[in-house]
Amino acid sequence: PPSGEVPTSIATCAAFAPLSVMYTAEGASLGSLRYDHEVNAIVMDMDVICKEPPRYAASGIMDGMAKMIEIQNGRSEILLDDVSIGLFTAYTIAEMAYHVYEKEAHQACHDIAEGKLTKAVEDIAYLNVAVAGIVSGVSKGFGQTALGHETYELVRTHFTQEAKPYLHGEIVAIGDCLQLAFNGHPEQVAPFRDFMRSMNMPLTLEDIGIDSNSPKMENLFQDLFHSPFMEPTAENEARLRKAMHYLSAD
């Protein structure tokens, strides 16, 4: 039967993405169920959306921006000859969204903080939920997320209590600093962090109460290295080890 969603927040694309993310009662990650089809309709009451805490909108913005960064996963660029047409389509849409986020994100969060419904708010709501969900759909739920989102899952798993106060996109953005470095673009981390800072986001694991010298950080590294997003080569192990520093070094 047809199904629909009525999201009251634009903090994630969960309402339209063809998957269900699961957690334990304690809040640790429990994996995802993936579906062949998304819901039939999404109805958003924009009078509700424009009055949500701007932190939710900012988190959804960072989650949306993550798509372009994570689709690259280890590549310095995405070329049609190298990837499936579905993933190339996902990247093209994600790249468009990234540029709109750069242009309109701050205005949208400012307007939401004032409870005003503006074009910027409508644009960002559409990107956060519909477009991010489409990116997930055209890539069949695989390939549009990688190390940034996997870092989120592992932080929820290994540092469950520390992660509890923080939103999905806030932790994903920290993981995407690692992702940028792994993609071969460490020079992009500083401007990306500047954008995070301008959105009042935490920048590092320390900012969300995690000790980067904790023994559990090695568990996080090993789980990332043995994740489906990583070919287990010596070269990738060295690249990932180096990229891990960007989870904490500000």
Indicate residue ranges for each PLM-predicted region.
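Generic structural signal for hydrophobic core residues of well-folded globular domains
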Residues: 68, 72, 155-159, 179-183, ...
